[in-house]
Each structure stands twice: as structure tokens, then as C-alpha cells.
Amino acid sequence: MPTATPLDVSELIGCLGHGEISAVDVVREQIEHLRDVHEATNCVAAWNAAAESQAAALDARFAAGGPIGPLHGVPITVKDWIDVAGMPCTGGDIAHRDRVPTRDATVVARLHAAGAIVIAKTTVQVDSELWGSVRNPIDPTRSPGASSSGEAAAVGGGGSFLGIGSDSGGSLRVPAAWCGVATLKPSAGRVPITGHFPRVGERVDGRTQIGPLAASVGTLARVLGIIAGPDGVDAGVAPVPLADPAAVAVAGLRVGWFLGDDSFPTTPAIRNAINHAVQQLESLGALAGGAIDPRLDEALDITLRYWKRSSGRLEGWDVEAHLMDWDRYRSRMLRAHAGVDIVVMPVTLATAPLHRDMETSDYIFTMPASLTGAPAVVVPVGFDAQLPIAVQVVAHHWRDDIALRAAAAIEAAS
């Protein structure tokens, strides 16, 4: 099995931008790395046969002195729920195995315009009728997480510099935590989901957000600046300016925390990691804001009814009651978070379990930010028995910049 070491994109961008290495060479080498990771994890759903020719076109433009984008020549992978023109997009469903979109999803088009090159689509779900089981790059006997598991395995195994996945209830955050990579679930309404399959109104609604997975929080911030903003199609995306995380001062930030509760207890290693992260922020001048209760039992009840509604098993007055309870939960969380800027909390109850189907409790700590639409960053902070540990940094809606800056500070101290 290849060494499971996520690759940071910053140095690569510098080398490509200065002509020290060609995009073709980078793409060829990265495809070989990804093949090794795929052999170990089963993370690839489809390969892009045009990747080298796309890289050659970028090299020709660079040689001619033409403009290059901020991700010039960077090889990336994309979850097989997100359209890439000319490549299969099945959503992991055997009924759609022959579906090949003719246009890119908005986020993919923006990444292409920035110079990125899609080298592969990645598998979804832990187990799939189309592809079989996805394995964790750290330990193949362990689960890689939820539906963005192929992306997390590709990035966590060092097969991809940057992954693009999606998250409705934790599908970016749980795989990232278990595979040892950073990720961002952006604020609801920040990034268009045009070109996400299944479509809005089928099995996807306003909880679903597209976001990046990478080796570092800095790369997440770089990519968010590229993919965010209205596209004239997704009516759920608002023209809210994206503030620069680098402009956020950690000193003075009010930090809340949650360690778990009696109903959903976390392991000692995870509780210690959260306490350490909070202490690191306080050492930089952040202010202790106290413990925050995310009302997990309430979040679980609303989420379970959401799943029933999305599958047509909730009708009539029950649907209206569910939506009213969801609104009340959002209001309660606004009041609970009023005295803090961020909350540092667990991503999961424990480190990656032995390979199994996902359980509802695996998502318990990711449910609150999914229901409120708040931005949430997952940042790896260490290991317990050689398995990755991560913490989740949740900020107020639209304050992706604060979540990213605080997570970067935690990352730097880890």
C-alpha cells in the first residue's frame, strides 16, 4: 500500500507557475500515484482519458506567455455525484451507469477556468453495487466514512492534491476525519450545486453543499475563493461577499466548545484534542466563551424526519410540523451561539471503526451545522492508536472566513 500522506498544493502551484515543472509531467506522475492509491483503497470510479491533452494545452499557453489561472496545472479529483463533461456521473447507482453529462457542474467549470485538471472521478458510499467497498488509506480494515469516502481516500492516501465532494449530513466531514484530511462544508448558499447529481428536488435540497478536501486548511480557503458565488442557475446561492480568512484576527475571537454528552460520549482522545485546540486558540488571544449545547437529541429527531420526508415517508401535516421544528432548532442555535464566534466540537464519536455500514450515530456531531447551514471546517489534529483524530470548527452562517482562520490556527499548533 502507498504511504498515506496527503499532498499540499501550495508548493506545486509555485513550481508550475515558475515553469520549474510542466503540467503534463505533474499529471502523468499524479495519475500513477492515484493508481497505486486506488489499488489499495478502490477510490476511483472513472479516469479522465483527456487529462494529459488538457495538461499539454495548459503548457502550450504558458510557453506562449498566455495568462494562467490560480490552480494552473493542478491535478484534482471529483466525487461521482458532481458532473464533469464527458465523464460518467452515476451517483453510485447502477441504474445510471451509462449516464455521461455534456456540461460541467458550476464548481468544476470554475476549477477548470482556474487551470485545474480533473484526472479522475471518485467512488461514493462505503459499499457500492457498482464498485464494491472503498477502503481507508490509513488502515484498509477501517471505514473511510460516508458518501465522499472515495475523495477522502484519494486525498488522504496522497493520490490527489485536491478533492471536490459534497455534504448533506456529514458526507465531507466524517470521511475527512477518518482519513486524516481537512475539509470545509461551506455556509449554505455560498457555493452553487448546479450539476450535482441527484438534482435539487429529487434527493437533494438546501442541506447539500459542495466543498473541497485537501491536506491543509489554506488550500480549502484558496479553493473556496474560486468556487463560491452565484451562477445564475442555483437560486439558493446569495451574492454575499466572501471575506478573506487572512484578515481575521484570532485574538479576541470568542471560542465555545462541546465535548460530547451522556447520550453521545466521545473517546478520551477526542475530548483531549478539543480541549487542546481551545487552549491553543486561547494562547493566541482568543477568549473562552464556555460550553455550548448543540441539542443533539433534537438535531437527531429533525434529521430522522428529514430522511423520511426526502424518501416520501412523511406527508401532509407531518411535513409542515417537521419544517416548523427545523426552523425552531435554527433559532435556538442562533441564540445558543450568540455569545461566541466559533464552536470547537467533535466530528465523530471515535476514530474510524472497522469496515461496516454507516450508522446514524456516525453523523450525530455533523447534524447541527447541516441543519443550521453554518460553515464547518474539519482539521486533523493528531492520532489515537495510529488512526487520525480531527476536530470540527463551526462558525456563524456566512462567516466561513472565521471558521477557516480558526481552523488554520489549530492546524498550525498541531
Language-model features and meaning:
Residues 12-18, 95-99, 208-215, 393-394:
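Short, well-ordered beta-strand elements within core beta-sheets of diverse protein domains
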Residues 1-53, 282-283:
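An N-terminal boundary/leader segment
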Residues 36, 156-256, 275-284, 371-414:
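Structural helix-boundary/capping segments
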Residues 19, 30, 73, 79, ...:
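Glycine-rich, small-residue loops and helix-cap segments
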Residues 37, 71-210, 260, 312-313, ...:
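Short glycine/serine-rich loop/turn segments
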Residues 71-91, 249-258, 279-339, 380-390:
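Short helix-loop capping/hinge segments that flank enzyme active sites or metal/cofactor-binding pockets
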Residues 110, 152-154, 280, 367-370:
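Hydrophobic/aromatic ligand-binding patch that stacks against planar heteroaromatic rings
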Residues 51-56, 115-116:
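Long amphipathic alpha-helix in the N-terminal Rossmann-like dinucleotide-binding domain
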